[in-house]
C-alpha cells in the first residue's frame, strides 16, 4: 500500500520524537542506588579495575562494597554462607525462570527452591494445555502462554520484521489520509469486541510472566469497556488518571502498529470487507479467552447481526482517545456520567453513541507517535494502564476486583499502593490461595504455609550435625548451633557485652536505657520484663481462687496457697534446713542456704580460679577482670559495674535520702552514713 502525505508526515514526527527521547535520556544522570545491601552487591559485581586510581584503592573499594553487601557485623557466618550459596543458585537457574525468581527476591535457599518448584510445575502444566490441531490452525490456551513455550508449537509462526511497512488495514482506516469514515462500521467493531476477563484462572496467572510481546491488531481491538456504574464509583482524581493512562496507551499502540507485521487468523476479519468476526476463536497473541453469555446476560444483535455479549445492567462505554483526554464534550443528546450518589444515569441514545464512536477521525487526534516501547505491551481493559509483563497486569487487575467487592463498604485500606493488598483482597473473597487443610489457617505466601504445615505433620527436616537434634525451621537450627560453637554475634554498643540471641541483647539494652515497656494497668508501675509484670499483677488479684478463713487473703496460684496454708496450719514453711532449722518458701532458696553449711562453691572463675557459691557473685566478680561497667548514669554519663552503685549514685542527682534516723528524723542517702550517725545517739 502506498504511503500518502499524511503517512510521511507521521514518519517525520516519529523521527523527531525518537531524537527528543534519546536526548532526554542522555541528559538525565543515572539514579544513585543508595547504600542498601542490594546496591552494594550490584556495585561489587560490576566494579572494574579501571575505576580505581591503583591496585590498593581497587582492593579497598572492593572490601568496602563487599562489607556493605554481606554486613558481617549483623550476620553470622552461616547467614553469610547461605547468602553466597543463594546468589550462586540464582545464577545457575534456567533463563526462562531466572529473572522471575530474582524479581521476587527470595531471602533464603529454601524459599528460592520453593519458588522454582512452583514455577516448574506451572510451566509443565502450561505445556500440557497446548492443543495442536494440525498445520495452519490456532493454538487454544486457557491462559497466556510464555513466548518460549509458544515457539515450540508448530502452529506458532513469526514472520520476519519488515523494515518499511505501512500501517495495518484496520489502523489505516482510522489513520488514513481521508477524514471521512463510516461511523456505522466503527461502532460495529467496537460493540463486537470481546470483554476481557478480569479474573484469571485460579492460582495460575500470578506465577506466569509473559516473555513475548502481545500486541493488538488495531485501535479498535484495545477499546476498553467500562460500565457506567463502575465509572460512577470512581472519584474525580481516578477518572482523570484513567483518561491520561488510556491516552498514553493508545499512543503506544499507535506507534507499535506500524512496526508489527500482521498475522492473518482464520475466521477473523481484519479488513473492511464486511465479513463476520468469529468471537469463538481468539488469536494467541491477543491473549483472550473465548467467552459466551454468562447467567444474567443476554445477547443483542448489532447493525449487521454480529452477536455480542453484554450484561443487562451494564451499558458498554467505549473510551476513545478524544474522550480519554476529555476533549470530546458530552452533549445533552449523548448524556453525561454522574456521580454514584445521584444514581440517575441513562444510556445515551442510539444516534448519540454512533456520533461518539465516530469522534476520533484522524491521526492528529490520536496524539503524537512515540518510540517503540517493547516493555509496555499489556493494557488494563478497565483503566488503560500499561505494564511491561503479564504478571504485573494480573496483579494490577486485582485492584479493580477489590474495588467491585468493596462498593458501599469501608475498604479504603485497599487503595494507595498498600503492600498487603493481596491479603486484603483474598480476605474479601472469603478465601486465600494458601490455606492449611488441617486447621483452615490462611497464609499469603506458599513458604509460610509449608512452614506452618510442619506443626501438624511433626516434620523436622533441619538436623544438628553435632548432637543430632532436629528442628522444623532453619532459623531455629542456627540459633541452636550457637550453643555448640559458643558464637555470640550480638554485641551491645554501649558496654560491649555480647549475646547469642537478639532477644537477650534487647533485654540487656534496657539496663542502659532504663526502658520499662511493660506497665501494670492497675497501678501504673512499669517493668523491664514481661515476667516481672506477671508476678506483680498477682498482688492485685486478692479476690481470686484460694480464699482463707484465717486471714481473709487470696492468692493467684496453688504454690503460694500451699505456702500460706502451711504458715497458718503448721506455723512453719515448706522447706526447712535440717542443719539449723531455718525454713524457706522455695526449694532454690534452701539449696542456696545449704551451701553456707557445706561450703560448696560450684561457680569458678576461669581467669583467676576463684570459686563462688552463687552465680550472681561470679558474674559480679568477672567484671573486675573485664572492666565491664554496664550500668550508666543518664544524667552525667558515669558507668558502674554494679547496679547498687548506680542506684546510690543517682541519689546525688535526685537528692533522695531514703534512710531516716528514728531518733532525730535526719535523713541520709546511704545506710552506712545512717549507722555512723546513730552512734552519736547511743554514745
From Swiss-Prot:
Task: Please list the residue ranges annotated as the SCAN box domain.
Answer: 41-123
| Tissue expression pattern | Expressed in heart, brain, placenta, lung, liver, skeletal muscle, kidney, pancreas, spleen, thymus, prostate, testis, ovary, small intestine, colon and leukocyte.
Q: Which Pfam families match?
A: KRAB, SCAN, zf-C2H2, zf-H2C2_2
- Which compartments does it reside in? Nucleus
Q: Which UniProt keywords apply?
A: DNA-binding, Isopeptide bond, Metal-binding, Nucleus, Phosphoprotein, Repeat, Repressor, Transcription, Transcription regulation, Ubl conjugation, Zinc, Zinc-finger
Locate the compositionally biased regions of type Basic and acidic residues.
Answer: 230-246
Q: Where are the zinc fingers (C2H2-type)?
A: 378-400, 434-456, 462-484, 490-512, 518-540, 575-597, 603-625, 631-653, 659-681
Q: Where is this region: Disordered?
A: 147-185, 230-301, 322-368
Q: Which GO terms describe its biological process?
A: negative regulation of transcription by RNA polymerase II; positive regulation of transcription by RNA polymerase II; regulation of DNA-templated transcription; regulation of transcription by RNA polymerase II
Is Cell cycle one of the keywords UniProt gives this record? no
* GO MF assignments: DNA-binding transcription factor activity; DNA-binding transcription factor activity, RNA polymerase II-specific; DNA-binding transcription repressor activity, RNA polymerase II-specific; RNA polymerase II cis-regulatory region sequence-specific DNA binding; sequence-specific DNA binding; sequence-specific double-stranded DNA binding; transcription cis-regulatory region binding; zinc ion binding
InterPro entries cross-referenced by the UniProt entry: KRAB, KRAB_dom_sf, SCAN_dom, SCAN_sf, Znf_C2H2_sf, Znf_C2H2_type
Q: Does the keyword Phosphoprotein apply?
A: yes
The segment(s) forming the KRAB domain are: 217-289
What is the recorded post-translational modification?
Answer: Ubiquitinated, leading to proteasomal degradation.
Spell out the subunit comment.
Interacts with a number of proteins involved in chromatin modification and transcriptional corepression including DNMT1, DNMT3A, HDAC2, PHF8, TRIM28/KAP1, SETDB1, EZH2, UHRF1, CBX3/HP1-gamma, and CBX5/HP1-alpha; recruits these proteins to the SIX3 promoter region, leading to SIX3 transcriptional repression. Interacts with MAPK3/ERK1 and MAPK1/ERK2.
Name under which the protein is recorded: Zinc finger protein 263
Q: Which gene encodes it?
A: ZNF263
Amino acid at each position: 500500500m502506498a504511503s500518502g502525505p499524511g503517512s510521511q508526515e507521521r514518519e517525520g514526527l516519529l523521527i523527531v520524537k525518537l531524537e527528543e527521547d534519546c536526548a532526554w535520556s542522555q541528559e538525565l544522570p543515572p539514579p544513585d542506588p543508595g547504600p542498601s545491601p542490594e546496591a552494594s552487591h550490584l556495585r561489587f559485581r560490576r566494579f572494574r579495575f579501571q575505576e580505581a586510581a591503583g591496585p590498593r584503592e581497587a582492593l579497598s573499594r572492593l572490601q568496602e562494597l563487599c562489607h556493605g553487601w554481606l554486613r558481617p557485623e549483623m550476620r553470622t557466618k552461616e547467614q553469610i554462607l547461605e547468602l553466597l550459596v543463594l546468589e550462586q543458585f540464582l545464577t545457575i537457574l534456567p533463563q526462562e525462570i531466572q529473572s522471575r525468581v530474582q524479581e521476587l527476591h527470595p531471602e533464603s535457599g529454601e524459599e528460592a527452591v520453593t519458588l522454582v518448584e512452583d514455577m516448574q510445575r506451572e510451566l509443565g502444566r502450561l505445556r500440557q494445555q497446548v492443543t495442536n490441531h494440525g498445520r495452519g490452525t490456532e493454538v487454544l490456551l486457557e491462559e497466556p502462554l510464555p513466548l518460549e513455550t509458544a515457539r515450540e508449537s508448530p502452529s506458532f509462526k513469526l514472520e520476519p520484521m519488515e523494515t518499511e511497512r505501512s500501517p495495518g488495514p484496520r489502523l489505516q482506516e482510522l489513520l488514513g489520509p481521508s477524514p471521512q469514515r463510516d461511523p456505522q462500521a466503527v461502532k460495529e467493531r467496537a460493540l463486537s469486541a470481546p470483554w476481557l476477563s478480569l479474573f484469571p484462572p485460579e492460582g495460575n496467572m500470578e506465577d506466569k510472566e509473559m516473555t513475548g510481546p502481545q500486541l493488538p491488531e488495531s485501535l479498535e481491538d484495545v477499546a476498553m469497556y467500562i460500565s457506567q456504574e463502575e465509572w460512577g464509583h470512581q472519584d474525580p482524581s481516578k477518572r482523570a488518571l484513567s483518561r491520561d493512562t488510556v491516552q498514553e496507551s493508545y499512543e503506544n499502540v499507535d506507534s507499535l502498529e506500524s512496526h508489527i507485521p500482521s498475522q492473518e487468523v482464520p475466521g477473523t476479519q481484519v479488513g473492511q470487507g464486511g465479513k463476520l468476526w468469529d468471537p469463538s476463536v481468539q488469536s494467541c497473541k491477543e491473549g483472550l479467552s473465548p467467552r459466551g453469555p454468562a447467567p444474567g446476560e443476554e445477547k443483542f444483535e448489532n447493525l449487521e447481526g454480529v452477536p455480542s455479549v453484554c450484561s443487562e445492567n451494564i451499558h458498554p462505554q467505549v473510551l476513545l482517545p478524544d474522550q480519554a483526554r476529555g476533549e470530546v464534550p458530552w452533549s445533552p443528546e449523548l448524556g453525561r456520567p454522574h456521580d454514584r450518589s445521584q444514581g440517575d444515569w441513562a444510556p445515551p441514545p442510539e444516534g448519540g453513541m454512533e456520533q461518539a464512536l465516530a469522534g476520533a477521525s484522524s491521526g492528529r487526534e490520536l496524539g503524537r507517535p512515540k518510540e517503540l516501547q517493547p516493555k509496555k505491551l499489556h493494557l488494563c481493559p478497565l483503566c488503560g494502564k500499561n505494564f511491561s509483563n503479564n504478571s504485573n497486569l494480573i496483579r494490577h487487575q486485582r485492584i479493580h476486583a477489590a474495588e467491585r467487592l468493596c462498593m458501599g463498604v469501608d475498604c479504603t485500606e485497599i487503595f494507595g499502593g498498600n503492600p498487603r493488598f493481596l491479603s486484603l483482597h483474598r480476605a474479601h473473597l472469603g478465601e486465600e490461595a494458601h490455606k492449611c487443610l488441617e486447621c483452615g489457617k490462611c497464609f499469603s505466601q506458599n513458604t509460610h504455609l509449608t512452614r506452618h504445615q510442619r506443626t501438624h505433620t511433626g516434620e523436622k527436616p533441619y538436623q544438628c550435625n553435632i548432637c543430632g537434634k532436629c528442628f522444623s525451621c532453619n532459623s531455629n537450627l542456627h540459633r541452636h548451633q550457637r550453643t555448640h560453637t559458643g558464637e555470640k554475634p550480638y554485641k551491645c554498643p554501649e558496654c560491649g557485652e555480647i549475646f547469642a540471641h537478639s532477644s537477650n541483647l534487647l533485654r540487656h539494652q534496657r539496663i542502659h536505657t532504663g526502658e520499662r515497656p511493660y506497665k501494670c494497668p492497675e497501678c501504673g508501675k512499669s517493668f523491664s520484663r514481661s515476667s516481672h509484670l506477671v508476678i506483680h499483677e498477682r498482688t492485685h488479684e486478692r479476690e481470686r481462687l484460694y480464699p482463707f478463713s484465717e486471714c481473709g487473703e487470696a492468692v493467684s496460684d496453688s504454690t503460694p496457697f500451699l505456702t500460706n496454708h502451711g504458715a497458718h496450719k503448721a506455723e512453719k514453711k515448706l522447706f526447712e534446713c535440717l542443719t539449723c532449722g531455718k525454713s524457706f518458701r522455695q526449694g532454690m532458696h534452701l539449696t542456696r542456704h545449704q551451701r553456707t553449711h557445706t561450703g560448696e562453691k560450684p561457680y569458678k572463675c576461669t581467669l583467676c580460679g576463684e570459686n563462688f557459691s552463687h552465680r550472681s557473685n561470679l558474674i559480679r566478680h568477672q567484671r573486675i577482670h573485664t572492666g565491664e561497667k554496664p550500668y550508666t548514669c543518664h544524667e552525667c554519663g558515669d558507668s558502674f559495674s554494679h547496679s547498687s552503685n548506680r542506684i546510690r549514685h543517682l541519689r546525688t542527682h535526685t537528692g533522695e535520702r531514703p534512710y531516716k534516723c528514728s531518733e532525730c528524723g535526719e535523713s541520709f542517702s546511704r545506710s552506712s552514713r545512717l549507722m555512723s550517725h546513730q552512734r552519736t545517739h547511743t554514745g
